[in-house]
Regions:
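Extended glycan-interaction surfaces of carbohydrate-active proteins
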Residues: 1-25, 48-83, 107, 112-133, ...
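N-terminal beta1-alpha1-beta2 module of alpha/beta enzyme domains
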Residues: 11, 20, 24-32, 36, ...
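Residues that mark the junctions of alpha-helical repeat units in TPR/alpha-solenoid scaffolds
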Residues: 27, 31, 79, 83-86, ...
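Well-ordered alpha-helical scaffold segments within catalytic/enzyme domains
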Residues: 32-46, 85-102, 143-160, 193-204, ...
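Flexible, glycine- and charge-enriched loops at secondary-structure boundaries
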Residues: 76, 103, 162
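Loop-centered beta-sheet repeat module
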Residues: 134-179
């Protein structure tokens, strides 16, 4: 774990941004995943520098661009899943540190981000991925559902109530569970496990879903295939399935 965290820290830019690889592009979701990894490894100062980057780069509407390169915007559209994920990272850092002063600073950032995402929620309850309202993703919306639960926990820690967020999460979950036709059909493993990881599918239904997709996506002795019809086993999907199994118990 230390070697992985040291690799992340080595890739981190002086402004706090964490690209995919040294000199590569940055997206807010992977940036946040990396920041959480830094916290787990005890590199709290580096993690806070990553959150400072988010504070400085949040746009007036509460969103971030989908991709950055060389310190500037490379793809300006908002990815709703990427923007919502700041709630997950913020809750994680607060649980690790207990730093209320830091949370007071981050709360307005989270509040604006969730507002930006929920402006894309449709009457069906689903949330569009980017600019095209017709594209809605199972994994992305499941991740947003997770982010909403964490945003609500942060609101509670702040002594605030956001009933509209509860309603948004309820409607989003109902769409994911009851209206599969709304979402793009994809062959990716993440569409199999993310509804469980995002607490959309729970209990016996989660166990059944894992069992139904296991042979389709899991390569024994190796890990998880990124897509069911190709032989590649990927570290990211394997790690996420491990988290899903841990969350399921």
């Amino acid at each position: 774990m230390k070697a992985t965290a040291d690799g992340i820290a080595a890739a981190q830019r002086p402004d706090g941004g964490i690209p995919w690889e040294p000199g590569g592009h940055l997206d807010p979701w992977n940036h946040l995943e990396a920041a959480m990894g830094l916290d787990v490894a005890g590199l709290g100062a580096e993690a806070e520098a990553a959150y400072d980057w988010l504070v400085r780069n949040q746009r007036p509407d509460g969103s971030w661009a989908a991709r950055y390169r060389d310190g500037g915007i490379d793809l300006s559209t908002m990815d709703t899943n990427f923007t919502a994920y700041v709630a997950v990272g913020t809750r994680h850092h607060f649980l690790v540190t207990g730093d209320r002063t830091w949370l007071d600073r981050m709360w307005p950032v989270v509040d604006r981000a969730i507002g930006a995402v929920l402006r894309r929620q449709q009457p069906s309850g689903a949330i569009s991925w980017r600019d095209d309202p017709g594209i809605r993703l199972v994994a992305g919306c499941s991740s947003i559902h997770h982010a909403l639960t964490q945003a609500l926990a942060l609101a509670s820690a702040m002594g605030l109530h956001r009933p509209q967020w509860w309603d948004a999460a309820r409607r989003l979950r109902a769409a994911l569970l009851g209206e599969p036709r709304l979402f793009a059909a994809k062959p990716h493993a993440m569409d199999w496990y993310y509804p469980i990881l995002g607490s959309v599918v729970t209990g016996a239904d989660a166990t059944a879903r894992l069992a139904a997709g296991w042979d389709r996506f899991v390569e024994p002795g190796l890990g998880v295939r990124c897509v069911h019809h190709e032989p590649w086993v990927t570290g990211g999907e394997t790690a996420e399935l491990a988290l899903t199994l841990a969350a399921r118990g």
